[in-house]
Curated annotation (Swiss-Prot):
GO terms for cellular component: lamellipodium membrane; SCAR complex. It holds the Pfam family Nckap1. This is Nck-associated protein 1. The gene is nckap1. It comes from Xenopus laevis. It is found in: Cell membrane; Cell projection, Lamellipodium membrane. GO terms for biological process: cell migration; cell morphogenesis; cell projection assembly; cortical actin cytoskeleton organization; neural tube closure; neuron projection morphogenesis.
């Protein structure tokens, strides 16, 4: 097979262009990272900033590229010491520059080959060949510009080479050429303009072919709107027709890329601008569109200035310089507005497209081209804005700020999501298209070719066979398609048929090129949807504009109408890894970490914003709930009572206070309250949080809803504790009922969040409220349980001990007593049945158990002190125990007792604490009976049916269960546990038992002394005594039950003994004649009745045998009579 000396098939143009383009991007990545490292003092190679090497570095740079080591020993002495380390650490940098040089050689060789072969280049016909050719030239140009921007390049290369020479006795073999290249490309564009003179014909032909594409792509928003671009519903009759074009791949080709080709390309072959009007118009159009172009990532080129600086030194280029200045002025004044209008149009166009496709995903088949065009157009506009916002004068900054950019990105993400979700739908459509239409048309085209060499015939036959063999069943079976080989074959075929002496020339068979370009697009719809999404909508460039990225996000959150699109920012973080390259693997971790930190930060900020809105709504709702509290109706009642009298006076009364609920009355729908605004803002933001169930960023899965959940938990915890309004200095705290109202209002708002976001708010309640039933939460902070427990113990019960508050059994509450110093709180408002029920609701069984344990700890400390007093009087008490029927001896023994008042006071304190606990337990039982009636009744059955012969351990387990449910027990398990901890190793069990028995004796013989106390008078109205001695009944019974359970004694026998001693002692005061000692005798008699009434072990018959009932009856008559007299 005879061909020309340079056979196209042997030159492998397609393969070389593919490989060199990929390698060029890799080299750019490496140079970019070197430039950034050298610009960062922390990442810069230490040898460049080492003070000891400063003179050596300056010398090397000054002499570069010459190498002089002989006569400069003094300056290079320090270098001699560190040569091995320098060789080791600068090798990566040095050989990157060597790789750039080799890449340059390969590119120059390939460009020469293309020139020699006289390759025909037309973007509308041999798209892949032309695109790759232009990409290679731009990559090569960018690479050399990037190289020239690394200021430390001479120092790095020189340091490495000098170290190499000192180590090996000779320069590195690549150094001479490398050094010369660095010097030659000090001004890269100027050097390349000279270098590209021989390539001008090929390059200008390729660029001129863009005349068919670029002008019709670079239109204004108004022209787009008039053409109804990207609209599926503008022509309903053609909705199902496939979107077709003679230049399919050009339709979604990046405008940004084309502008880069045109601007850099015509700078390199500038001669044609003077001879060809088409080229000049194309170039001027591109110059007017931007102020700068992207070289790589965030590296830009201000091309107006660069071109002007190059042309100013060329004779006869005044016209071109004027053109540049004119275009620059036009770009500065009009480009911002033009692109702003485009973004505005694209927002509505993409919204329409996404909405239609979500409703009818089947349209993704025929209208796939529209989707990728929309993505490409939007991506170009976003990148343009990002690039210019960071590189424009502050005077015109307003044109480059777009508060609605998040909306455009969001619709891009929606379209991307549709393509990923409905990929199989598109596959089915295009598999049928390829086999049923494309294969047939291509076969006819091939059959009609007048000339078709063997190689080309084989390739095209394989195309037809491949497409014909496709079937829908392959899609249904989940078969993985791979048309990469077919696409590479078409690329090869373009190369074979585009050379000047080709037997089958594409210039003569343009229809074949256009048909194949369409077929290639269709194959990509089957096997390369993900790659197509990256090609048309990758926004990984945001990774390198972190400040602008974060600023856009903050603007989005601040604008309520845009906050619903804020999820687009975390979604963009999923793009970042696509900008990495295998030739620079070391940056993967850096970019991956950045994507993770940004995604985390965005989701966290969104959740915080939502949390703050929810908190504001909760605050409003708590205020509204507070208005409904009973305390606020007092003013209304007083106004109603005084209404008549105010009418009679004829004076105008006070204006009526607004009643709760008035905020819901609207005069018209235009009235918007603060609560309305908050709900609107919240619903918008929650839409965003709920949009994506999860997202994968660098193999890490993020769940936006979990961010909101965790923030709600933290804020709910803080709010509950904050709403207690506990002040440690003044000892003020919110009433439990008011806190409960606020908490319920808060929970109602949180429950409504489930209408916006699919989160498990019950889980939040369980986590937070259960933690609040413990002493400390998971962060070690105090909870409402600890705050209320401390307050009731340290404030309320302490004031009871001080005599400022009394327990009123009739009211089942603690009530303030009139004293000189008024208390800062009303005890009744914190201890009545409604407040205790509210407390039980808030603390729950666990919290109430903690409260009980804290109360018992205080009781145990009082019992410990009582035991000490018993030990002090042990001999006297032992004798009194056996002499209760000998009045004279008892009187003598009583006089020898010490600390009688202390014993009674401590027992009263114990009684007060137990009375408070009984209130708390009763409230807990009421609350649990409401919430879990069947479970409470089952526990009650357990407790009521314990056989007397049951083992005490088993009985105590049942009592513990009952106590946790708020049920009263014969023996208090919490008290037993608290007193059991007092067991001493130094005292024998027998001695402990004896002390317990004598304690009961001490209390019994001390009771008569209460009669002399003025405050011991019984009040029938409160069913108790103002000095709380009525609480002794509870204290005596429960302490006896607990102590004798611990010491395995008979509770009943010991209480009988107590009753005998107490009745004997009280009967003696009946014989007393001193009115002072017997002033409240009748009131004290009633204690015996209370003790028996309180006890499950004593009976009235037993009391009758010890103490005549007639005395009790007379005592009741006397105290009631006395109360009537005192009240009258």
């Amino acid at each position: 097979m005879s061909r020309s000396v340079l056979q196209p098939s042997q030159q492998k143009l397609a393969e070389k262009l593919t490989i060199l383009n990929d390698r060029g991007v890799g080299m750019l990545t490496r140079l970019y990272n070197i430039k950034k490292a050298c610009g960062d003092p922390k990442a810069k190679p230490s040898y460049l900033i080492d003070k000891n090497l400063e003179s050596a570095v300056k010398f090397i740079v000054r002499k570069f590229p010459a190498v002089e080591t002989r006569n400069n020993n003094q300056q290079l002495a320090q270098l001699q010491k560190e040569k091995s380390e320098i060789l080791k650490n600068l090798a990566l940098y040095y050989f990157t520059f060597v790789d750039v040089m080799e890449f340059k050689d390969h590119v120059c060789e390939l460009l020469n080959t293309i020139d020699v072969c006289q390759v025909f280049l037309d973007i509308t016909v041999n798209f892949d060949l032309t695109k790759n050719y232009l990409d290679l030239i731009v990559t090569y140009t960018t690479l050399m510009i990037m190289l020239s921007r690394i200021e430390e390049r001479k120092a790095i290369i020189g340091l490495y080479n000098y170290s190499h020479e000192m180590t090996h006795g000779a320069s590195d073999r690549e150094y001479p050429r490398l050094g010369q290249m660095i010097v030659d490309y000090e001004n890269p564009l100027k050097k390349m303009m000279e270098e590209f003179v021989p390539h001008s014909k090929s390059l200008s032909d390729a660029l001129i072919s863009l005349q068919m594409v670029y002008p019709r792509r670079n239109l204004s928003a108004e022209q787009w709107r008039n053409a109804q671009l990207l609209s599926l519903i503008s022509a309903p009759s053609t909705m199902l027709n496939p979107a077709q074009s003679d230049t399919m791949p050009c339709e979604y080709l990046s405008l940004d890329t084309m502008e880069k080709w045109i601007i850099l390309g015509f700078i390199l072959c500038h001669g044609i601008l003077n001879t060809d009007a088409t080229s000049l118009n194309l170039w001027k159009l591109a110059l007017q569109s931007s102020s700068c172009i992207c070289l790589y990532r965030d590296e830009v080129l201000h091309f107006h200035k660069a071109a002007e600086d190059l042309f100013v030194n060329i004779r006869g280029y005044n016209k071109r310089i004027n053109d540049i200045r004119e275009c620059k002025e036009n770009a500065v004044s009009h480009a911002g507005a033009t692109h702003r209008e485009r973004r505005k149009f694209l927002r509505s166009a993409l919204k329409e497209l996404a909405t239609v496709l979500s409703d009818q995903p089947g349209l993704l088949g025929p209208k796939a081209l529209f989707v990728f065009m929309a993505l490409s157009f939007a991506r170009d506009e976003i990148i343009w804005l990002l690039r210019h916002a960071d590189n424009i004068p502050k005077k015109i900054a307003d044109d480059f700020m777009d508060k609605h950019i998040a909306e455009l990105i969001f619709y891009m993400e929606e379209l991307r999501a549709h393509v990923r979700k409905y990929g199989p739908v598109m596959q089915r459509y295009y598999v049928q298209y390829l086999s049923g239409f494309d294969a047939v048309v291509l076969n006819e085209l091939v059959q009609n070719l007048s000339v078709c060499p063997e190689d080309e015939s084989i390739i095209m036959s394989s195309f037809v066979n491949t497409m014909t063999s496709l079937s829908v069943k392959q899609v249904e079976d989940g078969e993985v398609f791979d048309f990469r080989g077919m696409r590479l074959d078409w690329f090869r075929l373009q190369a074979y048929t585009s050379v000047s002496k080709a037997s089958l020339s594409l210039t003569d068979h343009r229809e074949l090129g256009k048909m194949m370009n369409t077929i290639i697009f269709h194959t990509k719809m089957v096997d390369s949807l993900v790659e197509m999404l990256v090609e048309t909508s990758d926004l990984s460039i945001f990774c390198f504009y972190s400040r602008a990225f974060e600023k856009m996000f903050q603007q989005c959150l601040e604008l309520p109408s845009q906050s619903r699109y804020s999820i687009s920012f975390p979604l963009l973080c999923t793009h970042f890894m696509s900008c990495t390259h295998e030739l620079c693997p070391e940056e993967r971790h850096h970019i991956g970490d950045r994507s993770l930190s940004l995604c985390n930060m965005f989701l966290d900020e969104m959740a915080k914003q939502a949390r703050n809105l929810i908190t504001d709504i909760c605050t409003e709702q708590c205020t509204l709930s507070d208005q409904l509290l009973p305390k606020h109706c007092a003013k209304t009642i007083s106004q109603a009572v005084n209404k008549k009298s105010k009418k009679q006076t004829g004076k105008k009364g006070e204006p009526e206070r607004e009643k709760p609920g008035v905020e819901s009355m609207r005069k018209n729908r235009l009235v918007v309250t603060n609560l309305d605004k908050l709900h609107t803002a919240l619903s918008e933001l929650c839409f965003s949080i709920n949009y994506a169930p999860n997202m994968v960023v660098w193999e890490h899965t993020f769940t936006p809803r979990e961010y909101l959940t965790s923030h709600l938990e933290i804020r709910f915890t803080k709010s509950i504790v904050g709403m207690t309004m506990y002040n440690q200095v003044t000892q003020e705290i919110a009433k439990p009922s008011e806190l409960l109202t606020s908490v319920r209002a808060y929970m109602t708002v949180l429950q409504s969040i489930e209408n916006y976001v699919q989160i498990d708010i019950t889980r939040v309640f369980n986590n937070v409220l259960l933690q609040q039933t413990q002493h400390l939460d998971s962060h070690g902070e105090p909870t409402i349980t600890s705050l209320y427990t401390n307050w009731y113990l340290e404030t309320l019960l302490r004031q009871v001990s001080n005599g400022h508050i009394a327990y009123f059994p009739a009211m089942k509450a603690f009530v303030n007593l009139p004293t000189e110093n008024e208390l800062t709180f009303n005890a009744e408002e914190y201890s009545d049945i409604s407040e205790m029920r509210a407390l039980s609701e808030l603390l729950g069984p666990y919290g109430m158990k903690f409260l009980s344990e804290s109360l018992m700890w205080h009781i145990s400390s009082q019992v410990a002190e009582l035991k000490k007093l018993v030990v002090e009087n042990v001999e006297v008490l032992t004798q009194m125990r056996t002499s209760f029927d000998k009045p004279e001896q008892m009187a003598a023994f009583f006089k020898r007792l010490t600390s009688v008042d202390s014993v009674l006071k401590r027992m009263t304190i114990i009684g007060v604490i137990l009375s408070f606990r009984s209130l708390a337990q009763e409230a807990l039982k009421d609350v649990l009976s409401y919430h879990i009636p069947f479970l409470v009744s089952s526990v009650e059955d357990f407790k009521d049916h314990i056989p007397r012969e049951t083992d005490m351990k088993v009985a105590m387990n049942v009592y513990e269960l009952s106590s946790a449910a708020g049920l009263p027990c014969e023996i208090d398990p919490a008290l037993v546990v608290a007193l059991s901890s007092q067991k001493s190793e130094t005292i024998s069990p027998e001695e402990e038992y004896k002390i317990a028995c004598l304690l009961m004796v001490f209390v019994a013989v001390s009771l008569p002394t209460l009669a002399s106390n003025v405050m011991s008078q019984y009040s029938p109205a409160i069913e108790g005594h103002c000095n709380n001695i009525h609480c002794l009944a509870k204290a005596i019974n429960q302490i006896a039950a607990a102590l004798f359970t611990i010491h395995k004694g008979s509770i009943e026998d010991r209480l009988k003994e107590f009753l005998a001693l107490a009745s004997s002692s009280l009967l003696k005061i009946g014989q007393e004649t001193d009115k002072t000692t017997t002033r409240n005798r009748e009131s004290v008699y009633l204690l015996l009745d209370m003790i028996v009434q309180e006890s499950p072990f004593l009976t009235m018959d037993l009391l009758e045998s010890c103490f005549p009932y007639v005395l009790l009856r007379n005592a009741y008559h006397a105290v009631y009579k006395q109360s009537v007299t005192s009240s009258s």
